[in-house]
């Protein structure tokens, strides 16, 4: 890493070179921008899917006769490739088969599924078919029903243990239980949330530790003293006090409960009291009575009574016998076991836990309430923390996380007896590191084991889960009177995803230590407490529910088939007379995989995080793939007003972009990954940093999670940091950050430094030059509007870029990349053939004028030539909005900031007619129209050119089959596909019967159902695709044939279209001015766009001004370098690379310019620069098929480290613009008058984008159209050919102007006066006098509502005649039409 003083030529690809102004050069390789979900889904296919299914096997029948084992998964190849899937509207998918075996223990037979003879032609895989699974493409998308979709990653709270001041337990969609105080929230990945807390509603001297648990039916929550739960888990009261060193909160918890050994027999519940009385009376047969789960407690009480009798007899006979004390100890131990079982029973009943769990001997080896409760909490399948949760818990509950700046209250020894730290030591970083190191090496002597009243192995409590660490520290560093034990977990096993008893102990210790300021509260908005769920986790969670349902169906079938697989017939005397064989069991008859297929289909079609891929342009597609959402299942609602969740957090630095987010209700909930961010195996976001050792920046790059970053001091990379040739920091102090605080630090104390200044923002934000000079709100708009840019016919890369354009275009998936290093053997408009170094040939088919999800045009343009050498992953063909392998979202145009007759008032934009004529901002839109030929109950529909009641003019472009021809120019109403449908059974009149008898072939019982071009769809037919069952295509049920017609629209820029820059500067075109009338420079160069100068200061996006000046300097620099090359052959050779043009084109250009110079008699370079203007150069460019847009000299100014004020002055001086004199303002001449403007005007080259908010998609007109069935008013919206709403305020406006007749028409015949509009239509057709409007339906409806209130309503006309409103129907009955209609027949379908 080293600092660069000014600039250098940086070559991004063979066709893209820029003058790079970055002040910090680094060799850090940016990761692939689109492979996060690809790697995640590949992990799911390779590992997660098989592991998920294997976790449910083996499955056994209730009597263990049948066992189904899982042997693995098999995958089939896709039936069709990606292109076929898109074209045929099918899913690009693979088949998943399970290799299962059925073992019959009664006969010893092993059965495996085989492919059936019936399906042998279509399936070559043995095993049980589970589902078809969509396959991810090389570009990271799924093709589902021919549509490209993508699954957004979800960011949620990570499972783990959190210390909070307030938490809540969700009981239902509308009910929740809020708890405040010192709260420890145990948040699992699978299972119910638990709250261990000390309430703040009591005085601290009266408070004790409680736990809040949600019941099994999730309808309520129960509170228990924490010691009750610990006793139910098998800890005695003495053991609890020993672990927590008689802590006051724990002591009060023991006093608050009823399960105390001293008075348990006196204050016991009636059940135990009755058992004691009956066993003391000698009724020993009660041990086996009652339900099975109660037998354990009965047995314990019975054993206790026997010991009690033996103790009583021995103490009376031999009071001093040592055996008396042993009996008392045995009785105490047995009493602890009774308390454990009784407390467990109490909690099981309170939480409504089903006793059916005792039937599963794998989960409950012992038939007891204690075993049932332990299986509920300590089994991974019941209560799963997940790998991320275990990582968080292990980190949170370590002792070393809580004892910083505390004083040791005891001597700390190693196992060999050596003193590690003595009592009274203040624990700072060095001492804590010693403890960590000794603990990792298992050398320290502070590990203890929980002693249980039961056998831990009998309830799946491993010995490792009972180990804990304990260390005493003083509460106050100044007063050593009070000490407390800090309890933590020991030797955390990251593979154990279940919660353990030591986790409970450590969590309780955390809660009781928090009031003593030992430990810290968690910030739930910190990224260390959030994790990202990628597609493998999202689909696994949905798939798990489908497998669970399949398992339940399978067990039900095994239960039916269990026992003896033979039927018995019994006679009247009850004797078996015959045994009949049942149908033989097979795996395929047992497995029902429909639930799995349903959840997969629903996931890719209806899941909240599965979206249509944004195909607007390459940036929008790539940003879509890097987006993360806080919404979705289990996430945050967009209506949630919590601002803390949406706000920027310091831990997001380098991980989540602080700029790119939507502006509406989703602000802060939809986010974008930062440029270099990665996701680790646990789902935590990571940012890269360079390691600093003793003040020297090394080349070692580490990716840190937010939690790890909090442990280090990190410096910002900046041009202000002085570094020598060995990368040693020379400054005495540099800016660094530790967590949320910034300060000046000695370089020797700094651990890491940023890898690049732009690592903090997303790829979209990193494309904005001079981002540091824009207001944050405008930067957000600029980032979002870049994703709305419409791909143009002639895209050009920005003159002023940031250096990210090539990387984004290459990783977007829309460009064609070389599959290997080699030589181009063949290239044309449709394919490229590359021969690799090993001699293997690769042929790549280019995409030509295909439609995207957003109706934009996909087209590949080759960049390579035959014989050219290419390297692997090099861009060999441009895609949409890509020019010479760089992202090209718009055009470089000459912009001036001045007013122009008020046409650019506010944000309106005035443009030159040149942008229209030269197709500078022209785009292509491709619309798809589909016609399906269906099989109906009345017969099959037919594709035909013989359409009834359609003129030849409307069928002029149809071929002999009735399908539109490619290249036809179609307009609204033209037939695209001729189709007729059979009519239903109708009664035929005598006349029709006679006509049919005379002309049997001319009468067709069909109706016209042709596909016609809708309103606003005018264009040229670019492609027609035809699929039919007869040709072997797979179509949907009931579809015989399907035709897709693609119509291309060439949309030139026009008034009403929206334009935008990259700095949040946007506006709508208000005027297209002839080139001759536009203001122009003194050399005659006309301005392309006029912007309002008042739109800059208040918006505070000054970056656009810097961009404009730098762009104009680069534009003029290219012109000067071109003229200089005419006088210096060496400069001519270097110019080809600098302006990114082939040498042969440049030679022709220089030859033409030399001819101009010679003809004018210009002797030297200075004279040529002074006298050759843009018009002279434009003539030469036109002769060789180029334009000024091809001559731009491109620069790269990376954000936060790019062009500064001095650099800008230098390049403007180099371009001859004299910034000291002109200040970037130039003399403009009014094209209409020929007079100069009063003062110089700021102008320059700015990058302008055409957004997808085009007027053609919004404006429309309605003459005749559909009406609402209910209100009889016209429908609304362009899609329904609706009308414009004339609301209350518009009525006021016409009333104010006294436009009574206009208002009457709008409220009657143009709205819902049914009779009046029919009469008006007939009058127009006949040329008759215009009738008077009638009463609108809405007024008639009002009268009916008033009548519903028991009010009598009458109409009184101007002539004082009166009519009862009861005689007025809301709609006129059929057959009551006006006489004007007698001669007309109307088709009222849809109106």
UniProtKB/Swiss-Prot annotation:
Lyase keyword on record: no
Gene Ontology cellular component annotations, sorted alphabetically: DNA-directed RNA polymerase complex
Keywords: DNA-directed RNA polymerase, Nucleotidyltransferase, Transcription, Transferase
Pfam (any one): RNA_pol_Rpb2_7
InterPro entries the record matches: DNA-dir_RNA_pol_bsu_ext_1_sf, DNA-dir_RNA_pol_bsu_external_1, DNA-dir_RNA_pol_su2, DNA-dir_RNAP_su2_dom, DNA-dir_RNAP_su2_hyb_sf, RNA_pol_bsu_bac, RNA_pol_bsu_CS, RNA_pol_bsu_protrusion
GO molecular function, one term: ribonucleoside binding
UniProt EC number: 2.7.7.6
Complex and partners: The RNAP catalytic core consists of 2 alpha, 1 beta, 1 beta' and 1 omega subunit. When a sigma factor is associated with the core the holoenzyme is formed, which can initiate transcription.
Annotated family: Belongs to the RNA polymerase beta chain family.
Described purpose of this protein according to its UniProt entry: DNA-dependent RNA polymerase catalyzes the transcription of DNA into RNA using the four ribonucleoside triphosphates as substrates.
Protein name as catalogued: DNA-directed RNA polymerase subunit beta
């Amino acid at each position: 890493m080293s600092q660069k003083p000014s600039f250098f030529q940086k070559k991004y690809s063979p066709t893209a070179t820029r003058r790079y102004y970055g002040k910090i050069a680094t060799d850090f390789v940016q990761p692939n921008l689109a492979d996060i979900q690809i790697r995640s889904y590949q992990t799911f296919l390779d590992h997660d899917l098989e592991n998920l299914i294997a976790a449910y096997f083996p499955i056994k029948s209730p009597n263990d006769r049948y066992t189904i084992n899982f042997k693995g998964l098999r995958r089939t190849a896709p039936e069709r490739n990606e292109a076929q899937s898109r074209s045929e509207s099918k899913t690009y998918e693979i088949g998943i088969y399970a290799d299962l075996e059925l073992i019959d223990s009664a006969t010893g037979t092993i059965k495996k599924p085989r492919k059936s003879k019936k399906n042998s032609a279509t399936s070559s895989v043995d095993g049980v078919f589970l589902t078809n699974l969509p396959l991810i493409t090389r570009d990271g998308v799924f093709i589902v029903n021919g549509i490209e979709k993508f699954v957004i990653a979800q960011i949620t709270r990570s499972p783990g243990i959190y210390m909070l001041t307030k938490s809540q337990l969700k009981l239902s969609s509308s009910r929740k239980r809020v708890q405040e105080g010192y709260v420890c929230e145990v948040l699992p990945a699978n299972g119910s949330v638990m709250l261990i807390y000390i309430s703040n509603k009591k005085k601290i001297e009266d408070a004790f530790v409680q736990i809040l648990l949600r019941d099994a039916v999730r309808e309520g929550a129960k509170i228990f003293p924490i010691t009750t739960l610990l006793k139910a888990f098998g800890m005695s009261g003495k053991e609890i006090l020993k672990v927590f060193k008689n802590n006051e909160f724990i002591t009060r918890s023991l006093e608050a409960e009823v399960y105390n050994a001293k008075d348990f027999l006196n204050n016991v519940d009636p059940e135990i009291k009755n058992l004691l009385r009956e066993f003391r009376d000698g009724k020993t047969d009660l041990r086996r009575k009652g339900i099975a789960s109660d037998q354990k407690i009965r047995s314990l009480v019975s054993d206790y009574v026997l010991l009690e009798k033996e103790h009583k007899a021995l103490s009376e006979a031999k009071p001093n016998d040592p055996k008396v004390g042993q009996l008392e100890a045995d009785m105490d131990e047995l009493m602890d076991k009774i308390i454990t079982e009784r407390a467990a029973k109490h909690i099981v009943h309170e939480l409504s836990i089903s006793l059916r769990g005792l039937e599963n001997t794998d989960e409950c080896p012992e038939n007891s309430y204690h075993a049932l409760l332990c299986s509920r909490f300590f089994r991974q399948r019941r209560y799963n923390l997940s790998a991320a949760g275990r990582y968080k818990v292990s980190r949170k509950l370590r002792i070393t996380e809580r004892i910083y700046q505390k004083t040791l209250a005891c001597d700390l020894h190693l196992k060999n007896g050596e003193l590690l730290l003595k009592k009274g030591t203040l624990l700072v970083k060095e001492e804590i590191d010693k403890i960590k190191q000794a603990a990792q090496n298992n050398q320290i002597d502070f590990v203890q084991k929980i002693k249980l009243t039961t056998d831990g192995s009998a309830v799946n409590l491993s010995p490792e889960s009972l180990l804990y660490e304990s260390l005493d520290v003083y509460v106050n560093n100044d007063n050593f009177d009070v000490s407390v034990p800090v309890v933590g977990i020991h030797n955390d096993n990251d593979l154990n995803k279940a919660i353990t008893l030591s986790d409970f102990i450590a969590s309780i210790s955390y809660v009781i230590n928090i009031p003593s300021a030992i430990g810290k509260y968690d910030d739930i908005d910190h990224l260390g407490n959030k994790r990202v769920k990628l597609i493998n986790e999202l689909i696994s969670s949905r798939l798990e529910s489908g497998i669970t349902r399949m398992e339940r169906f399978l067990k039900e079938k095994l239960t039916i088939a269990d026992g003896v697989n033979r039927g018995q017939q019994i006679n009247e005397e009850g004797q078996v007379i015959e045994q009949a064989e049942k149908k033989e069991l097979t795996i395929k008859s047992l497995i029902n995989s429909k639930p799995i297929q349903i959840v997969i289909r629903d996931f890719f079609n209806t899941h909240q995080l599965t979206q249509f891929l944004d195909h607007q342009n390459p940036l929008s597609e790539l940003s879509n793939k890097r987006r993360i959402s806080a919404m979705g299942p289990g996430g945050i609602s967009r209506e949630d007003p919590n601002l803390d969740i949406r706000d920027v957090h310091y831990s997001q630095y380098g991980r989540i972009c602080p700029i790119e987010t939507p502006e509406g209700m989703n602000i802060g909930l939809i986010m974008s990954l930062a440029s270099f961010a990665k996701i680790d195996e646990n789902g935590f976001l990571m940012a890269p940093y360079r390691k600093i050792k003793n003040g020297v920046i090394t080349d070692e790059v580490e990716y840190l999670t937010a939690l790890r970053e909090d442990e280090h001091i990190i410096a910002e990379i900046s041009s202000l940091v002085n570094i020598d040739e060995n990368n040693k920091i020379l400054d005495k102090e540099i800016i660094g950050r530790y967590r949320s605080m910034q300060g000046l630090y000695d370089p020797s104390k700094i651990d890491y430094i940023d890898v690049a200044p732009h690592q903090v923002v997303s790829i979209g934000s990193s494309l904005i030059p001079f981002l540091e000079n824009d207001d944050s709100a405008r930067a957000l708009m600029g980032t979002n509007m870049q994703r709305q840019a419409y791909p143009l016919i002639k895209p050009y890369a920005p003159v002023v870029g940031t250096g990210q354009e090539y990387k984004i275009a290459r990783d977007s998936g829309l460009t064609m990349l070389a599959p290997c290093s080699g030589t181009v053997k063949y290239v044309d408009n449709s394919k490229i053939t590359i021969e690799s170094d090993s001699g293997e040939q690769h042929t790549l088919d280019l995409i030509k004028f295909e439609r995207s999800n957003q109706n934009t045009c996909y087209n590949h343009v080759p960049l390579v030539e035959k014989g050219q050498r290419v390297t692997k992953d090099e861009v060999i063909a441009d895609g949409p909005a890509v020019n010479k392998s760089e992202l090209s979202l718009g055009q470089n145009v000459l912009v001036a900031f001045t007013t122009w007759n008020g046409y650019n008032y506010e944000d309106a934009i005035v443009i030159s007619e040149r942008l229209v004529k030269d197709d500078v901002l022209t785009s292509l839109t491709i619309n798809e129209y589909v016609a399906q030929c269906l099989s109906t109950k009345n017969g099959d529909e037919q594709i035909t050119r013989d359409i009834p009641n359609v003129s030849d003019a409307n069928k002029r472009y149809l071929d002999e089959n009735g399908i539109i021809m490619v290249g036809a120019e179609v307009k609204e109403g033209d037939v695209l596909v001729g189709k007729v449908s059979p009519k239903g059974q109708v009664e035929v009149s005598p006349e029709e019967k006679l006509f049919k008898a005379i002309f049997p072939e001319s009468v067709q019982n069909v109706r016209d159902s042709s596909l016609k071009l809708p309103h606003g769809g005018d264009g040229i037919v670019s492609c027609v695709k035809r699929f039919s069952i007869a040709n072997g295509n797979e179509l949907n049920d009931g579809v015989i044939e399907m035709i897709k017609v693609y119509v291309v629209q060439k949309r030139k820029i026009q008034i009403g279209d929206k334009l935008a820059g990259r700095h949040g500067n946007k506006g709508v075109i208000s005027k297209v001015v002839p080139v001759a009338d536009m203001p122009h420079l003194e050399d005659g160069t006309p301005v392309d766009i006029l912007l309002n100068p008042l739109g800059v200061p208040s918006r505070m996006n000054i970056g656009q001004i810097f961009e404009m000046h730098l762009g104009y300097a680069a534009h003029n620099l290219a012109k000067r370098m071109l003229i200089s090359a005419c006088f210096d052959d060496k400069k001519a050779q270097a110019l080809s690379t600098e302006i990114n043009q082939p040498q042969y084109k440049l030679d022709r250009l220089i030859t033409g310019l030399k001819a101009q110079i010679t003809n004018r008699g210009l002797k030297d370079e200075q004279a040529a620069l002074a006298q050759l203007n843009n018009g002279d150069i434009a003539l030469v460019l036109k002769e060789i098929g180029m334009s000024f847009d091809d001559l731009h000299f491109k620069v790269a100014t990376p954000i936060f480290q790019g062009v500064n004020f001095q650099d800008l002055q230098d390049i403007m001086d180099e371009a001859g613009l004299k910034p000291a004199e002109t200040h970037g303002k130039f003399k403009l001449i009014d094209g209409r008058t020929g007079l100069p403007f009063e003062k110089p005007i700021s102008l320059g080259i700015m990058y302008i984008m055409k957004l997808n908010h085009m007027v053609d998609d919004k404006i429309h007109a309605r003459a005749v159209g559909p009406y609402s069935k209910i209100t009889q008013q016209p429908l609304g919206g362009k899609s329904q050919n609706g009308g414009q709403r004339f609301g209350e305020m518009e009525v006021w406006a016409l009333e104010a102007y006294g436009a009574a007749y206009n208002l009457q028409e709008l409220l009657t015949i143009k709205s819902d006066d049914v009779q009046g509009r029919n009469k008006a239509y007939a009058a127009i057709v006949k040329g008759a006098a215009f009738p008077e409007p009638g009463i609108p339906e809405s007024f008639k409806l009002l009268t009916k509502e008033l009548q519903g209130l028991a009010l009598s309503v009458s109409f009184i006309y101007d002539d004082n005649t009166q009519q009862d409103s009861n005689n007025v129907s809301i709609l006129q009955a059929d057959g009551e039409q006006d006489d004007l209609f007698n001669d007309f027949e109307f088709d009222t379908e849809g109106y």
